[in-house]
Amino acid sequence: MSFISCNGRVIHYRYSNNNSDQTFLFINSLGTDLRIWDEVVNDLKAFGNILLYDKRGHGLSDLAKPKYGLKDYAEETYFLLENLSIKNCTVIGISVGGMIAPILAHRHPERVIKIIVCGAANKIGNSQTWNERIEQVRLNGLKSITESLMKKWFSPSFTEKYPERVAGYKNMVERCDIEGYIQACEAIRDEDITEISKTLKMPTLCIAGSEDQSVPPEGVRTLSQLIKDAKFEIINGSHHMTCIDNKEIFTEMIIDFIK
């Protein structure tokens, strides 16, 4: 395990330097940690170096200061790139990670050569839905929402085939720091990357799950239309966590895009 201090708070990361000219930076979804990418990484490590990390208040990373916005999450990601001397990367983000990725590219375009956005939109949800979720988690804990989350994350066929894995991801969310989870909810609630997305010029791939109820395909398509020449792909039958729910197709799309 590797750790680094950023603004007096620890970030957990994993960097595999394969002596490649290409580096993949992965940014996780709400309530998860870097382990969600394990199987994808196994398929992509032959194509480049791998950098994964835990967002603030997730996994083994410390909580952020109050009022931590998505721009702050992006800046701590830049801090990692800077301190690991990674000059440029292909950034892959899912859900909130798919909002952080364009922000990073906008603020530090010299560091991002390609963007892959999965299950994200220029605006996810609205204030009412996020405030309701925040209130529920504060009052009843993360266990009160994980059953419904798993149904949104994974298709019935995946759940039937891999019940133990779904149970493991449920445990992952339930063990997330509640304040870290709420801080991320607030950051998503308060962010709209519409104008940022219009400034991006690097090659971009936007991937949607056809059955995604968290971020419907229309939202992902709208984001792709904001980014110059972005490519839009749908994984049929997939729910929100495309990188797990349909890992093989997901990885094939990435490999085709980076070649």
Predicted segments with their positions:
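Catalytic histidine neighborhood in serine/cysteine hydrolases
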Residues: 221-241
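Conserved alpha/beta-hydrolase catalytic His-Asp/Glu region
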Residues: 125-128, 140-198
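Short beta-strand/loop motif that positions the catalytic acidic residue
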Residues: 200, 206-208, 212
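Flexible "cap/lid" loop of the alpha/beta hydrolase fold
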Residues: 99-107, 112-144
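Conserved HGGG/HGGXW glycine-rich cap/lid loop of the alpha/beta-hydrolase fold
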Residues: 9-62
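Active-site loop/oxyanion-hole signature of alpha/beta-hydrolase fold enzymes
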Residues: 38-42, 51-92, 252
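Conserved alpha/beta-hydrolase "acid-adjacent" motif
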Residues: 213-219
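Catalytic histidine-centered segment of alpha/beta-hydrolase-like enzymes
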Residues: 238-247, 251
